[in-house]
Amino acid sequence: MPVKYGVPSDPDYNERLAEFEARIHRGEKIEPGDWMPEEYRRQLIRMISQHAHSEVVGMLPEGAWITRAPTLKRKMILVAKVQDEAGHGQYLYHAAETLGISREAMLEALLSGKAKYSSIFNYPTLTWADIGTIGWLVDGAAIKNQTMLAQCSYGPYSRAMVRICAEETFHHKQ
């Protein structure tokens, strides 16, 4: 049975909304087959797809430095980090797909400019120090933000964030 997303014109909307909010208040996770307000679903798609886009676009500046990293060890660290960032994007695209949007639609929205990604990745990484700054400041801030997201109310996003946070913390230590 397909999930029905709640819209205010539904006759039982207010009752379902009250139960939905009570579940969140109790700390329960909302799962893909559960009833949810349409606005909640739309905001999750916007937020998760932006996060996924940021992971994928975010690997580009570091990926460009793989061949120019100063040591073999640093090259290996960058390769692993870029690979993980691509994986993070995939986890997040999958979480968004559970809300009924296709990966193709998300990528089309990104390429058309309708969807966004973190603008920090628009700045050039002209030196190896720029890569260090990304690793220290940008990844450090992301870990703080993403740790909170691991506690979010939507189960697939929360579980993806638990895994992503563990990997991000590992990279931050390198």
Each predicted region: which residue ranges?
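Non-cleavable N-terminal signal-anchor transmembrane helices
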Residues: 1-50
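Conserved alpha-helical segments that form or flank metal/cofactor-binding pockets of metalloenzymes
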Residues: 2-20, 81-109
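Acidic/His metal-coordination segments adjacent to aromatic residues that form catalytic metal sites
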Residues: 29-49, 109-135, 152
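Helix-loop segments that flank and shape redox-cofactor active sites
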Residues: 35-40, 58-80, 142-158
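Internal, conserved structured core segments that host functional sites
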Residues: 120-173
